[in-house]
A protein has these predicted regions:
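Transmembrane alpha-helix boundary signature
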Residues: 20-24, 42-65, 74-91, 105-118, ...
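Short, small-residue-biased leader/transition segments that mark boundaries at the very start
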Residues: 1-3, 7-9, 437
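Membrane-interfacial helix-loop connectors
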Residues: 44-46, 107, 118-132, 136-138, ...
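Interfacial loop-to-helix junctions that mark the boundaries of transmembrane helices
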Residues: 4-5, 25-34, 55-67, 169-178, ...
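Transmembrane helical segments that form the transport core of multi-pass membrane transport proteins
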Residues: 228-357, 361-364
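Long, contiguous bundles of hydrophobic transmembrane helices that form the permeation core
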Residues: 186-253
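Alpha-helical transmembrane segments
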Residues: 61-72, 171-189, 259-277, 340-344, ...
Length: 438
């Protein structure tokens, strides 16, 4: 699989480099680039393993993983775009810290994607008067789009996969002290950075608009929170329904619509997709268009994510196949090794299958004490390490977690000059150094 792993690496490198060297070309032709890299994987794969196996692998990726992934992003993007937070709040270091902290805790309630889409526009609007603000969105990605999702299976898809394999729903609340420690460190770093940037803006004569007779916060489209709850319920059902006998055949397999060979669109997935799309439709039908206009709502961000991630999902299959086949032969047996291995791979591959690979590896080590899962008993510290690695390290790159790229795209749309792919990685590494330094 060396050649196909090279395709995945080249695809990621293309995403990283092309916006820097040929930004206009990339904006026009990113879909063509994704098709090219996908074909460079699919054609040699078909020649080596046979066309049926290649078709099955691509369809399994698209039907089994990508479809529910992009529908969830689409639903939350639509519903959050119909909610507008406004009022007299203006962006300053204290207000920004409070908003980031609240958004971080919201991530475990409505998911990192839901919280990101809900809070990103208010944060951008509150700080629209400022010039030095890219750091605000970088730390938004660190906190709201990633580490905040570690407390419940709703928060991040890897934990949902753990829940569907026997980890109790509230088990990840054990990560609360880890979350709080990281929040304190990150928000402290952020406050000092934002205070310096804020003072620079004030020195340059930039001043926020003072809104008299305005409430502190006013919410337009508040009824859309009901649709967010619908989407959260759909996500929970996707983890619960496959365990029920009513959704299993005699062999214990989840029932569904056969697509090709072993590829099946399961009934729980269909139910999840239907609920999410219904929530998005109702959101648009029941919310005045003026709310979306005031939010500067466009389809650009979700289109960009949909195009780029379909290529990433397809071309990352060889790397995941290597991981699955290697499994316990990787020689990773200690919690800290699990943390760094899961985290490093989750930075560039989808963190959900990466989490499952290492959870399966840990479950096959024949431990006798720990958390009982359908994959075997996993020691508490090892499960904590795998969970933190998958959830936290998704913040290391724009492609480590889907909300990262969504936030970047929306920030770019609103005139915030976000760091490049490698520039963002530098931010994440510097932040890690500062946390360790404290």
């Amino acid at each position: 699989c060396d050649w196909s792993s090279d395709v995945c690496s080249s695809d990621l490198l293309c995403i990283a480099v092309m916006p820097l060297v040929k930004p206009e070309w990339w904006e026009k032709h990113q879909a063509h680039a994704v098709i090219l890299w996908s074909l460079l994987f699919a054609i040699p794969f078909a020649l080596f393993y046979g066309a049926p196996k290649a078709v099955e692998t691509v369809l399994e990726c698209l039907i089994g993983d990508y479809l529910t992934f992009i529908v969830l992003l689409f639903g939350l993007f639509c519903v959050a775009g119909n909610i507008k937070l406004e009022g007299s709040l203006v962006g300053n270091p204290k207000v920004n810290v409070i908003m980031l902290a609240v958004g971080t805790f919201f991530s475990s309630c409505i998911g990192t994607t839901g919280a990101s889409m809900l809070f990103v526009r208010p944060i951008i609007q509150m700080n629209s008067w400022r010039k030095n603000k890219r750091h605000i969105m970088v730390f938004f990605i660190f906190l709201v789009s990633n580490i905040g999702g570690c407390l419940t299976p709703i928060g991040d898809p890897p934990l949902l996969m753990g829940f569907s394999r026997g980890v109790s729903f509230f088990w990840s609340m054990r990560l609360f002290p880890v979350l709080v420690l990281n929040m304190i460190l990150l928000l402290t770093i952020f406050y000092h950075l934002d205070k310096k940037a804020y003072q620079k803006d004030i020195t340059k004569g930039l001043m926020p608009e003072v809104k008299e007779n305005e409430p502190l916060i006013r919410i337009k489209g508040a009824h859309n929170f009901l649709y967010i709850v619908m989407i959260v319920i759909a996500v929970i059902l996707s983890g619960v329904l496959p365990k029920l006998s009513a959704f299993q055949n005699a062999a214990g397999e989840v029932i569904g619509i056969p697509i090709f060979r072993e590829v099946t669109l399961t009934v729980p997935a269909i139910i999840e997709i239907a609920i999410i799309l219904l929530a998005a439709l109702l959101s648009f039908k029941t919310t005045p268009k003026e709310v979306r206009v005031q939010n500067h709502f466009t389809w650009g961000a979700i289109q960009e994510v949909a195009v780029l991630f379909i290529g990433i999902f397809i071309t990352m299959q060889p790397a995941l196949m290597v991981l699955k086949s290697a499994g316990s032969g990787l020689g990773i047996t200690k919690p800290f090794e699990m943390f760094w291995a899961t985290g490093a791979l989750s930075s560039f591959l989808d963190n959900t299958p990466t989490y499952l690979v290492f959870l399966t590896t840990a479950g096959a080590m024949h431990f006798t004490t720990g958390v009982a899962t359908t994959l075997g008993v996993v020691p508490v510290k090892m499960l904590m390490a795998i969970s933190c690695g998958a959830v936290f390290m998704g913040a290391n790159t724009y492609i480590g977690n889907a909300p990262n790229f969504m936030v970047k795209s929306l920030s770019d749309e609103n005139g915030i000059n976000m760091p490049s792919f490698f520039g963002y990685m530098w931010w994440s590494l510097r932040s890690e150094e500062r946390r360790v330094g404290k």
